[in-house]
């Protein structure tokens, strides 16, 4: 395979010695990990990396703990005399967009994305609307590890409720497509009891769609529970029963999206990336015909995109890695199989709502059903992913040193040959090791994934 058409970025076994930051910010159990004391310290040390005189924005998802965490963050942030704008319930990409629009010094989003309701997290953005750099993460991480006593401001007079700004974010999305571009198209939205419920239905109705919304009210006890982008059974059923043309399922903070076509079939981030990318490529609007994706993306996507004459860059897992590679390669579109899609339309911030209105609007403009468009794209290689629970102290280096585990991977790679691959990754947000096997032989995929996962369970618990 030619190196000028596909490239890899980063060391896939890299592991930063961070105690608090994972793949996407700080995340853990809301009651036992994200205590008021820790959260206030996070806010305080954010003052040292989010520089400038502009306001600091705080957004949140619907989790029961989000209000408490927002208050504790504000206590820590209030030690510096600048305004703190409380956005309330909103999607993560809204925080990023509003930081740039209002020249804010930075922002924080309180969410644990697709994690269960009892978890929560904090994503930190600098004044560019981008997630803070690794250097800034290390600074905050080191300060938190040392448990330095910090001054806490009891008054929060500089906190201002600005939930009125959500309309600016919604309008920015509407401006990316033709008005009324979804007239009378039946579309199902799974709003996941989370952030997408703040504006998702209004957004699609403004474009003329006949919207059927499920899990549509913000509910901190139900967010991500058997719904949203990681639990698709409900939306599949509703799409089929309602004869909708398509459906879109979001995660807790609406930065990722998985689509369902009118036949009830899943269109994950790989397919979304290919479909949107091919539309841009056809209009000569894709620089170098390049897509950026991660090591988890399907080989079917890779081969199909190269056959179109495109270039593909793979990165480690995490939208921040995709973002960095897009900047380096001057790419305009990238994403992850999990449903994060990044585009220059919104300054390379993963945005599930943007991806959803783009796909649906392109379908309407082409005069094609999403199911038909999917059939014209690519056939994924059989791929199986098992998330294996492991002890909390297990690191990537520990995984690499297990002879039995390494041997099972090597044997699997021999069995697969050139038409398949094994990928092992420790989760950056949960005590899990993800075992993925991919090949043209479905039965071989099943047996090898199960075998490696069983050994991982035995070795790392």
Swiss-Prot record:
Keyword Lipoprotein: no
GO CC, alphabetical: cytosol
InterPro entries on file: A-D-PHexomutase_a/b/a-I, A-D-PHexomutase_a/b/a-I/II/III, A-D-PHexomutase_a/b/a-II, A-D-PHexomutase_a/b/a-III, A-D-PHexomutase_C, A-D-PHexomutase_C_sf, A-D-PHexomutase_CS, Alpha-D-phosphohexomutase_SF
UniProt xrefs under Pfam families: PGM_PMM_I (PF02878), PGM_PMM_II (PF02879), PGM_PMM_III (PF02880), PGM_PMM_IV (PF00408)
Positions contributing to Mg(2+) binding: 113, 251, 253, 255
Domain of life the protein comes from: Bacteria
Enzyme class, broadest EC rank: isomerase
CDD domains from the UniProt entry: GlmM
Record note on modification: Activated by phosphorylation.
GO terms assigned for molecular function: magnesium ion binding; phosphoglucosamine mutase activity; phosphomannomutase activity
Cofactor: Mg(2+)
GO biological process: carbohydrate metabolic process; peptidoglycan biosynthetic process; UDP-N-acetylglucosamine biosynthetic process
Reactions accelerated catalytically: alpha-D-glucosamine 1-phosphate = D-glucosamine 6-phosphate
Keyword Phosphoprotein on entry: yes
PROSITE patterns, sorted: PGM_PMM
Similarity field: Belongs to the phosphohexose mutase family.
Functional note: Catalyzes the conversion of glucosamine-6-phosphate to glucosamine-1-phosphate.
Name the record gives this protein: Phosphoglucosamine mutase
Species the sequence originates in: Prochlorococcus marinus (strain SARG / CCMP1375 / SS120)
């Amino acid at each position: 395979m030619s190196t000028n058409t596909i490239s890899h970025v980063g060391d896939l076994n890299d592991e930063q010695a961070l105690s608090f930051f994972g793949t996407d910010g700080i995340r853990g159990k809301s009651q036992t990990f994200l205590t008021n004391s820790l959260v206030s310290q996070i806010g305080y040390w954010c003052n040292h990396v989010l520089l400038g005189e502009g306001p600091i924005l705080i957004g949140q998802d619907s989790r029961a703990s989000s209000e408490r965490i927002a208050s504790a963050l504000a206590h820590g942030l209030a030690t510096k005399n600048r305004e703190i704008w409380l956005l309330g319930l909103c999607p993560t990409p809204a925080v990023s967009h509003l930081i740039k629009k209002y020249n804010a010094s930075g922002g924080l989003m309180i969410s644990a994305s697709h994690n269960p309701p009892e978890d929560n997290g904090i994503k930190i953005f600098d004044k560019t609307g981008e997630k803070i750099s690794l250097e800034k993460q290390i600074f905050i991480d080191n300060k938190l590890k040392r448990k330095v006593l910090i001054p806490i401001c009891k008054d929060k007079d500089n906190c201002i409720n600005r939930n009125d700004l959500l309309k600016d974010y919604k309008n920015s999305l509407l401006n990316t497509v033709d008005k009324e571009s979804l007239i009378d198209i039946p579309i199902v939205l799974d709003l996941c009891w989370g952030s997408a419920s703040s504006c998702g239905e209004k957004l699609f109705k403004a474009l003329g769609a006949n919207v059927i919304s499920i899990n549509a009210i913000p509910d901190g006890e139900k967010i991500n529970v058997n719904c949203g982008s990681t639990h698709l059974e409900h939306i599949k059923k509703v799409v089929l029963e309602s004869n909708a043309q398509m459906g879109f399922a979001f995660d807790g903070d609406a930065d990722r999206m998985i689509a369902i076509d009118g036949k009830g079939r899943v269109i994950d981030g790989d397919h979304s990336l290919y479909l949107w990318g091919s539309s841009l490529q056809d209009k000569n609007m894709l620089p170098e015909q390049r897509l950026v994706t991660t090591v988890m993306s399907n080989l079917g996507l890779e081969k199909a995109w190269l056959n179109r004459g495109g270039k593909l860059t793979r990165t480690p897992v995490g939208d921040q890695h995709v973002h960095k590679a897009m900047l380096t390669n001057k790419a305009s579109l990238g994403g992850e199989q999990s449903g994060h899609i990044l585009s220059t339309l919104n300054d390379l911030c993963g945005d599930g709502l943007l991806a959803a209105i783009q796909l649906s609007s392109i379908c309407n403009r082409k005069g094609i059903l999403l199911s038909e468009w999917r059939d014209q794209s690519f056939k994924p290689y059989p791929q199986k992913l098992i998330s294996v629970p492991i002890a909390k102290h297990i690191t990537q280096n520990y995984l690499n040193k297990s002879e039995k585990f390494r041997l099972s991977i090597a044997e699997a790679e021999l069995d697969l040959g050139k038409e398949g691959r094994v990928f092992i990754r420790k989760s950056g947000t949960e005590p899990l090791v993800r075992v993925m096997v991919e090949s043209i032989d479905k039965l071989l995929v099943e047996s090898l994934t199960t075998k490696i996962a069983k050994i991982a369970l035995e070795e790392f618990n």
